[in-house]
């Protein structure tokens, strides 16, 4: 039976950046890894309704810097920054070093695999038909410029006695092409019949410059120059 490698893991260092970017010696490595896990667990619990896509952790000079990618930055920040200050203190307590929290907005949540998977799971928990939820997610992603998308759900679909897997795909999703920018993520819907797993693959195009092209900040689109019309004297 054929098995699939994790689409994000195989592309790390090729077209995908790491979610934790720090270096440590042998003594500190395990502690840093443990605190990273606990920080992510804490933030995902506190920001369960804030549409968090990914959490990036850096450790510059005995401190911790956390960047939260979210589709709803207002919920993370709170009134006058109260909520983000509470999060900063919580992260500092867990990590044991001074903490800094940055917020990055996800402009197109329909093209983010984690947010799409979470959206489908929330619909399944509200008893929306699974086929309708899948097709809606696929249509929204393709409408906003995805080159391809595949959505898979598995479990007791529609309350059936026997669990099964169903999937829906549109466009191209080339899993073997390493330069392909494929966003992959999973989520779980906890229904009265049991857990339903959701997997989402979104193909956004090919990255030809490798990591150098990924890490370059996007340049603003150049404004076309207006031609001056010469008036008659």
Curated annotation (Swiss-Prot):
Transferase listed as a keyword: no
GO MF, one annotated term: rRNA binding
GO cellular component: cytosolic small ribosomal subunit
Keyword rRNA-binding appears in the UniProt entry: yes
Domain KH type-2 intervals: 39-107
Species of provenance: Cronobacter sakazakii (strain ATCC BAA-894) (Enterobacter sakazakii)
Function: Binds the lower part of the 30S subunit head. Binds mRNA in the 70S ribosome, positioning it for translation.
Quaternary assembly: Part of the 30S ribosomal subunit. Forms a tight complex with proteins S10 and S14.
Matches recorded under CDD domains: KH-II_30S_S3
Gene3D superfamilies: 3.30.300.20, Ribosomal protein S3, C-terminal domain
Family that this chain belongs to: Belongs to the universal ribosomal protein uS3 family.
Gene Ontology biological process terms from the UniProt entry: translation
Keywords from the UniProt entry: Ribonucleoprotein, Ribosomal protein, RNA-binding, rRNA-binding
Protein name: Small ribosomal subunit protein uS3
UniProt cross-references to PANTHER family, sorted A to Z: 30S/40S RIBOSOMAL PROTEIN S3, SMALL RIBOSOMAL SUBUNIT PROTEIN US3C
């Amino acid at each position: 039976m054929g098995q699939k490698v994790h689409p994000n893991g195989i592309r790390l260092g090729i077209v995908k950046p790491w979610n934790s970017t720090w270096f440590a010696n042998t003594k500190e490595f395990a502690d840093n890894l443990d605190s990273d896990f606990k920080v992510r667990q804490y933030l995902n619990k506190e920001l369960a309704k804030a549409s968090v896509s990914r959490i990036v952790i850096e450790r510059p000079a005995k401190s911790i810097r956390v960047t939260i990618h979210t589709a709803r930055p207002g919920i993370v920040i709170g009134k006058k920054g109260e909520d983000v200050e509470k999060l900063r203190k919580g992260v500092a307590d867990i990590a044991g070093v001074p903490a800094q929290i940055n917020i990055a907005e996800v402009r197109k949540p329909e093209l983010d695999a984690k947010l799409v998977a979470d959206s489908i799971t929330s619909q399944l928990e509200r008893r929306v038909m699974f086929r309708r939820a899948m097709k809606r997610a696929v249509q929204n992603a393709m409408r906003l410029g995805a080159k391809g998308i595949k959505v898979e759900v598995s479990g007791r679909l529609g309350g059936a006695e026997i669990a099964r897997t169903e999937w829906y795909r549109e466009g191209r999703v080339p899993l073997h092409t390493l330069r392909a920018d494929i966003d992959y993520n999973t989520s779980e819907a906890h229904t009265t019949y049991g857990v339903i797993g959701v997997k989402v693959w979104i193909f956004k195009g090919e990255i030809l410059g490798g990591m150098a092209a990924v890490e370059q900040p996007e340049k603003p689109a150049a404004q076309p120059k207006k031609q001056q019309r010469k008036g008659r004297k």
